[in-house]
Amino acid sequence: MLGRARKGYCAAVTRRIIGLLRASHFGPNLLVTILSYFFAQLYWWEGPAFVIAVGVFCGQLVVGWSNDLIDYKDDLLHNRQVKPLVSGEISVPLLQNCLRVILPIAILINLFGPLGFIGGGLSVFAIGWAVAYNFYFKFTIFSWLPFAVAFGSLPSCMALSKGQMPTLWMWLGGALVGTAAHFLNVIKDMEQDKASGIKGLPQRFGSKASLVSAFVLIATAVALLLLTFESLPSATP
């Protein structure tokens, strides 16, 4: 009897952990975290780079969890069972409590970690922009702006942590990739978003134009990276 209860408890905890990871939009979260580790290694050795990546991961948890909480009613309306809150894998109070815990952790790691107050401040600034998308920008023609700012800040905060001025390719390349990610992310729910009154730039463009825009933006970002490849920094202790 005790063994069954223990197994049931472990299964419930595991289900909640998986639900929390899914609510963070784990795929994109992991991708951004890996990219941050890559950029951090251009300036730092592996130890500090790992801490920087952890800070970015925590920031992505803030963004993803706040997004699912804000979108909960709309997700219910459209019966999006892929969302853990709608499927019942996790509850709203649980996600709210986790968000309250992770927010100060994300701020502290970014500000007091290897990024320092300047680089870490930019990272926290980017988190703020990403959360602002959930509250306001997603409904406007400037829905792309938080993505451009957040992705543009990702490599730039690494340079600032070493007292270096971020180069143009960091800001522009990151902004292009971020805007492309926004267009691609919206396509799958575009019609439901329109029905809910969400009128960001991709919704105004439509699916086909958004897909073409994303391709052009990514191609431009890749071309920019290739043109500036020799200017990539090398890690220093």
Per-region residue spans from a language model:
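Multi-pass alpha-helical membrane architecture of UbiA-family
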Residues: 2-237
